[in-house]
Each structure stands twice: as C-alpha cells, then as structure tokens.
C-alpha cells in the first residue's frame, strides 16, 4: 500500500493532484494520511473539509462561471480559436487545524492569517 510505504520512508508529506478518481475518495485518502501520520495537501477545498491538512487551489465556482461564459460565446457563433486564453485568478487556502493537531503539527500564524477558511 502506498501510504504504508510513505510511512516507512518517513515522508514529510504528500501532495495529491486533482484527479476524478482521487477526488471521489477524499475522505478515504485523508483518513489514510492521518492513520500513517502523513501531512497531505490537495488543490481542492473539499479535501481539507474531508480531513486533509491543507488545500490551496482555484475557486471552482469562479472557474465554472468562466466556462459557462465561454460556452455561451461559442453557442452564439464565436470560434473557439478566437477566444483568448484565460487563467484562473481566484485561489483559496483552507487549513484544517483539527488535522494539524492530530498530526502534532503547528500551523504558522502567517499561514492562518492568509487562510480563506480555517477548520477547527
């Protein structure tokens, strides 16, 4: 099992990339990370809400809104090749202090001050 191997290697942490397979298993992954005392972070906010240590990534609602605007423009006849490339501009940081405490970690006050949400 991957988490057991990470625990044996005394890994300092793990970063989970956004992936539909992993996203649907956020609770299980957060529980495994906790069981093996491995700090885990992800880009998606619901990972921290599910028990992961930290999430930092795009705001899904803002990105979905932009996708809808582009879809509307294409449906009205604009060519996709003519639309400018855009990148996300809104990001959020979520810190799960309950998980940090369970892992024996202290989150720096500067991180907490920048967090959009702190789960206690």
Enumerate the predicted regions with their spans.
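Short hydrophobic alpha-helices and adjacent helix-cap/hinge residues
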Residues: 1-120
């Amino acid at each position: 099992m991957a988490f057991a191997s990470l625990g044996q290697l005394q890994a300092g942490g793990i970063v989970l990339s956004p992936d539909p397979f992993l996203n649907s298993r956020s609770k299980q992954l957060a529980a495994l990370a906790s069981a093996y005392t491995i700090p885990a972070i992800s880009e998606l906010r619901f990972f921290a809400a599910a028990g992961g240590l930290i999430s930092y990534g795009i705001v899904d609602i803002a990105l979905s809104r932009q996708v809808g605007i582009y879809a509307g423009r294409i449906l009205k006849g604009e060519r996709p090749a003519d639309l400018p490339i855009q990148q996300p501009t809104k990001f959020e940081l979520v810190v799960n202090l309950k998980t940090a405490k369970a892992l024996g970690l202290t989150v720096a006050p500067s991180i907490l001050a920048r967090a959009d949400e702190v789960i206690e």
